[in-house]
From Swiss-Prot:
GO molecular function: ditrans,polycis-undecaprenyl-diphosphate synthase [(2E,6E)-farnesyl-diphosphate specific] activity; magnesium ion binding
Root EC class: transferase
Cysteine pairings via disulfide bonds: none
InterPro entries the UniProt entry points to: UPP_synth-like, UPP_synth-like_CS, UPP_synth-like_sf
Stated family: Belongs to the UPP synthase family.
Amino acids binding substrate: 22-26, 38, 66-68, 70, 72, 189, 195-197
Descriptive protein name: Ditrans,polycis-undecaprenyl-diphosphate synthase ((2E,6E)-farnesyl-diphosphate specific)
The species this protein was found in: Pseudomonas syringae pv. tomato (strain ATCC BAA-871 / DC3000)
Co-factor note (free text): Binds 2 magnesium ions per subunit.
EC numbers: 2.5.1.31
Lineage of producing organism: Bacteria, Pseudomonadati, Pseudomonadota, Gammaproteobacteria, Pseudomonadales
GO-annotated biological processes: cell wall organization; peptidoglycan biosynthetic process; polyprenol biosynthetic process; regulation of cell shape
Short name of one Pfam family: Prenyltransf
Amino acid sequence: MEKIKSAGPSSVPRHVAIIMDGNNRWARKRLLPGVAGHKAGVDAVRAVIEVCAEAKVEVLTLFAFSSENWQRPAEEVGALMELFFTALRRETKRLNENDISLRIIGDRSRFHPELQAAMREAEVRTSGNSRFVLQIAANYGGQWDIAQAAQRLAREVQAGHLQPEDITPQLLQTCLATGDLPLPDLCIRTGGEHRISNFLLWQLAYAELYFSDLFWPDFKHDAMRAALADFASRQRRFGKTSEQVEAGARA
């Protein structure tokens, strides 16, 4: 990742979420092992971080490893864990150089203790950075996220600190893994698939969806800028009519 340059203000989402799909297919197309696609995908991560930071996006959430990905071949899962561990150690310095804070969301209990320690260390080492938040979803699933939020609230009710009727969508949202961050405005999926695959199910309620046919390793600077330009061209109505939105913009 290069030293990130500043850019002027532009019409961009506060929070971008990305499903990084197509690493294996990228590798197969080149007659390479699947892990080669995941390694190549790291360059795309760096490129997207650079574009988002330049454009003044506040939060970038990357779907790195879903709770369903444990079902993949053991060799691939092992290679992904090793790559994740290496990237945490290697990229932390670059994140600090660019004032980027790292957060990791998901159920960490299945990860090796050494990897869990590396996650905590990277988060602590970047916690003082304030320019931009890079959030990695690892062993994450949207259904898991909603369930763990409901469990937290149920414990509060059980302890007598909360009444069932006190539970509102707003309160439940604060208990999600992303609770204190703005909701995603834009969700991008690469690889040509048109689904969200159990990613941020609650949080994506009003997000704009953008699908790219590019495999993730090929989704670099120009592709990310194109996605942001497409977002800027859309009118977000949130249930209102176009006339209401336009009138509100003029007010």
